[in-house]
Amino acid sequence: KITSKFGPRRRRMHNGIDVKVYIGDTIRSAFSGKVRVVKNQGRRVGYGKYVIIRHENGLETVYAHLSKQLVKEDQYVEAGEVIGLGGNTGRSTGSHLHFETRFLGQAINPALLFDFEKQDIVADSYLFMKGKNRYRRNNSSYASANGDVQYYKVRKGDSLSRISQKT
């Protein structure tokens, strides 16, 4: 169950979502990847105990407020592998998992990538462009929230320069 959504919150931006978990619940990696950060910001400060994983496609996922981290930095983890236990560490008002997704340092609303009720991904592939987030489900056409999708069929003799001028 989502207890707090992505977006502006009081005086600052909430760059992830909060998922209800109980202390000691198993937390698993969303995708395969390399553990980049395993840290503890301390009691009542920031994320508390947290893990950041960089996935092969460049996406990073953040798992915060853990009671225990079960991975080490530079460790490779598979999708679904246990990485920690749910908790209430750091700046937290109850047990929950703070979950963030980032691409090239930019926070992305996890609800655009995951359907938390169905426990599935939203799309089979994603295309991230400056100012635009697009996704594709089951090889259908790309969808965009602002409807500005453009297509271009590459023809013999086309160069990247020519294509960029036409799109």
Residue ranges: model-predicted function:
Residues 2, 27, 33-35, 74-86:
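A structural signal for short beta-strand/turn segments enriched in small hydrophobics and glycine
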Residues 46-54, 75-131:
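Conserved, short, structured surface segments that act as functional micro-motifs
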Residues 21, 30, 71-72, 77, ...:
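Surface-exposed strand-loop junctions at beta-sheet edges and helix termini
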Residues 38-40, 82, 87-88, 165:
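Short, surface-exposed secondary-structure boundary micro-motifs
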Residues 3-29:
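Short glycine/threonine/proline-enriched tight-turn/helix- or strand-capping micro-motif at secondary-structure
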Residues 1, 111, 121-144, 156:
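Non-catalytic extracellular/periplasmic "stalk"
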Residues 10, 134-167:
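Primarily a LysM-type cell-wall glycan-binding module
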Residues 29-73, 95-100:
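Zn2+-dependent peptidoglycan hydrolase active-site motif and core
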